[in-house]
Amino acid sequence: MRVKAGGFYMSGSDMKERLKSLMNEQKLAVLASSHKDEPYTNLVAFASSDDLKYIFFVTPVSTRKYSYMTSSRKVSMMIDNRSNNENDFKDAMAVNASGSVNEVEKTDAIVKLYLGKHPYLRDFLESPSSALMRLEVKNYIIASRFQNVVEMDMK
């Protein structure tokens, strides 16, 4: 994995660990999709794979969100650790994960991963009217201290 910071590539091990920590600590993300060139955002409960290549979330199939994602598979997701106070200007980290999304089978491994983070969402996940979605991350753009921006290519 290569990390691009200010036009230069560097080792991604430290940044990857910071990203893993954020992904494990945060329970919610803002999912952005679009329809007819209009953006649409939602909060979703998510879980990421250990290698950070995939982000999983659940949505009812009868929603606008599901319809938009199945017609245009390109989405992005923002995960952050802001606390809504002035310390955020120096301490907050925000991550944008971009890629393509698909509905996937509710396999034992993915269910275990998702419910390990969100055990209170078992009924929602297991409902026949819910779809398990997988975002295959193309890249992460990581912003910290509002000016330090790093890009992590996952391909």
Q: Where would I find each of the regions flagged by the language model?
A:
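A short, Trp-centered hydrophobic/proline-enriched beta-strand micro-motif
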Residues: 21-36, 75-79
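Structured helix-beta-strand junction loops
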Residues: 25-26, 71-72, 117, 127
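A generic structural signal for short beta-strands and their flanking turns/coil linkers
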Residues: 27, 42, 51-53, 71-75, ...
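A short, aromatic/hydrophobic, helix- or strand-capping loop or linear motif
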Residues: 35, 79-82, 123-129
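Charged, gly/pro-rich active-site loop segments
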Residues: 8-11, 90-155
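A short mixed-secondary-structure module that forms the rim of ligand-binding clefts
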Residues: 47-85
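Extreme N-terminal tail/first-helix region
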Residues: 2-29
